[in-house]
């Protein structure tokens, strides 16, 4: 009996890890990966960090260059797909080539959610999603520049930190570093994925670094001239050399939509990463999961891309699905490393340590059960915290925040 052929569509973290997971879980059939990027699949998190800070940064590949050939995975880079061929099981490229598939994994990722008012600025406006975006930004984040960033989510704050650090490192004694202003519609920073005490810490951290953060505000009018003139809802006018925005994502779902798969700013999948077509799976930023209660949930993180790649591979091969660890992601801002794990909801967080010393852990207890945590420059503690959250361990709050008691002894 001829082995089936699996095609992966996409060139990012989820796509590469799906290929790796399929081989690791025993799939020996024909395996193809199609990507519109010419690079080998590379890590996205460094784009807002080291790719902006280093003078000659190198892309960090998800898998070693020799892995693809050694594992007999056929890479098709720099190609454009015309249709997935849901009915015919024939993927068609714009160059006329067609490729048969028995199962399909879609990991086309997402793009920056558009902001037409700023997109009209053309090359003077920046978003960050690909290596080319980081290369363009690296060139313009120079001393003396005025930089306006729209959006104070994770990417917006990382960009603010990187812009401040890069210009400070490059300036001469007579030059000033970038003047960075962040505009945020909400009343706080990182409102979607950080608890209140961490939001307050990050706001203060950026302000101390010289970043101006304007909350409860938005751009109403833009005039393009020698500098970009931005008029805000508050009535204030800003002058900018560089304008960057990051206000969320827009899933790259067009191919799926044209194939009549269920979409809702993302390809709708179940908890096995299966779409409404049992032969088609999806994962990473392009996917949105329908939970048991019918709600749609998207998790935009490096780890989620890895997890869904493993889940989809197991489901495609008819194997038991791996157990999911608690959600986890990290953010590097200035010299700080913050790691977020578990449930970020709720207002009653406990703090172990002193954030003013840039070393602390915030804990989220629900009826004594640890359900979430954030570490500030305490990454070594994530491993035991992950185990505690997975096991539903209960704690005495006073003992948990007592620095005289080692966490590992609890």
Curated annotation (Swiss-Prot):
UniProt KW keywords: Aromatic hydrocarbons catabolism, FAD, Flavoprotein, NAD, Oxidoreductase
In short, the EC number is: 1.18.1.3
Report the protein name in the record: 3-phenylpropionate/cinnamic acid dioxygenase ferredoxin--NAD(+) reductase component
What is the role of the protein in this entry? Part of the multicomponent 3-phenylpropionate dioxygenase, that converts 3-phenylpropionic acid (PP) and cinnamic acid (CI) into 3-phenylpropionate-dihydrodiol (PP-dihydrodiol) and cinnamic acid-dihydrodiol (CI-dihydrodiol), respectively.
Enumerate the residues binding FAD: 5-36
**What is its cofactor?**
FAD
The entry's NAD(+)-binding residues are: 146-184
In what pathway does it function? Aromatic compound metabolism; 3-phenylpropanoate degradation
- Please name the top-level EC class of this enzyme: oxidoreductase
Which Gene Ontology CC terms are recorded?
cytoplasm
Supply the InterPro entries for this chain.
Answer: FAD-oxidoreductase/Apoptosis (IPR050446), FAD/NAD-bd_sf (IPR036188), FAD/NAD-binding_dom (IPR023753), FAD/NAD-linked_Rdtase_dimer_sf (IPR016156), HcaD (IPR023744), Reductase_C (IPR028202), Ring-hydroxylating_dioxygenase (IPR053382)
List, in alphabetical order, the Gene Ontology terms for molecular function in this entry.
Answer: 3-phenylpropionate dioxygenase activity; ferredoxin-NAD+ reductase activity; oxidoreductase activity, acting on NAD(P)H
- Where does this protein come from, organism-wise? Shigella flexneri serotype 5b (strain 8401)
Query: Which family is it part of?
Result: Belongs to the bacterial ring-hydroxylating dioxygenase ferredoxin reductase family.
Query: Which GO biological-process labels does this protein carry?
Result: 3-phenylpropionate catabolic process
Pfam families the UniProt entry points to: Pyr_redox_2, Reductase_C
Q: Which PANTHER family match?
A: APOPTOSIS-INDUCING FACTOR 1 (PTHR43557), RIESKE DOMAIN-CONTAINING PROTEIN-RELATED (PTHR43557:SF2)
Question: Would the keyword Oxidoreductase turn up in this protein's UniProt record?
Answer: yes
Record's subunit section: This dioxygenase system consists of four proteins: the two subunits of the hydroxylase component (HcaE and HcaF), a ferredoxin (HcaC) and a ferredoxin reductase (HcaD).
Report which reactions are catalysed by this protein: 2 reduced [2Fe-2S]-[ferredoxin] + NAD(+) + H(+) = 2 oxidized [2Fe-2S]-[ferredoxin] + NADH
């Amino acid at each position: 009996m001829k082995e089936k052929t699996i095609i992966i569509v996409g060139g990012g973290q989820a796509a590469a890890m799906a290929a790796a997971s399929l081989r690791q879980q025993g799939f020996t059939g024909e395996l193809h990966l199609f990507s519109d990027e010419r690079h080998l699949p590379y890590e996205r998190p460094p784009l807002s960090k080291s790719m902006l800070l280093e003078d000659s940064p190198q892309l960090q590949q998800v898998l070693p260059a020799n892995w693809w050939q050694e594992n007999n995975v056929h890479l098709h880079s720099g190609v454009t797909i015309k249709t997935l061929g849901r009915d015919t099981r024939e993927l068609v490229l714009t160059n006329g080539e067609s490729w048969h598939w028995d199962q399909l994994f879609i990991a086309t990722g997402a793009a920056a959610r558009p902001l037409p008012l700023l997109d009209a600025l053309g090359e003077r406006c920046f978003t960050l999603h690909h290596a080319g975006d980081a290369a363009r930004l690296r060139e313009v984040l120079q001393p003396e520049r005025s930089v306006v960033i729209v959006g104070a989510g994770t990417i917006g704050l990382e960009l603010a930190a990187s812009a401040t650090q890069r210009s400070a490192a490059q300036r001469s004694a007579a030059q000033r570093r970038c003047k960075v202003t962040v505009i945020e519609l909400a009343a706080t920073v990182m409102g979607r994925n950080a608890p209140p005490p961490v939001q307050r810490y990050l706001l203060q951290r950026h302000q101390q670094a010289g970043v101006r953060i304007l909350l409860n505000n938005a751009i109403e009018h833009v005039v393009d001239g020698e500098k970009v003139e931005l008029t805000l809802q508050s009535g204030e006018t800003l002058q900018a050399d560089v304008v960057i925005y990051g206000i969320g994502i827009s899933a790259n779902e067009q191919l799926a939509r044209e194939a009549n798969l269920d979409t809702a700013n993302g390809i709708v999948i179940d908890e096995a990463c299966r779409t409404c077509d049992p032969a088609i799976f999806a994962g990473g930023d392009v996917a949105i999961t329908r939970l048991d209660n019918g709600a749609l949930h998207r998790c935009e993180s490096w780890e989620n891309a890895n997890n869904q790649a493993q889940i989809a591979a197991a489901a495609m091969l008819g194997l038991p699905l791996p157990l999911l660890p608690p959600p986890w992601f990290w953010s590097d801002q200035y010299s700080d490393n913050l790691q977020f794990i578990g449930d970020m909801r709720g207002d009653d967080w406990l703090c172990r340590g002193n954030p003013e010393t840039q070393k602390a852990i915030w804990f989220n207890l629900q009826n004594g059960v640890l359900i979430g945590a954030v570490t500030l420059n305490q990454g070594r503690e994530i491993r035991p915290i992950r185990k505690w959250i997975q096991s539903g361990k209960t704690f005495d709050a006073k003992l948990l925040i007592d620095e005289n008691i080692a966490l590992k002894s609890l």
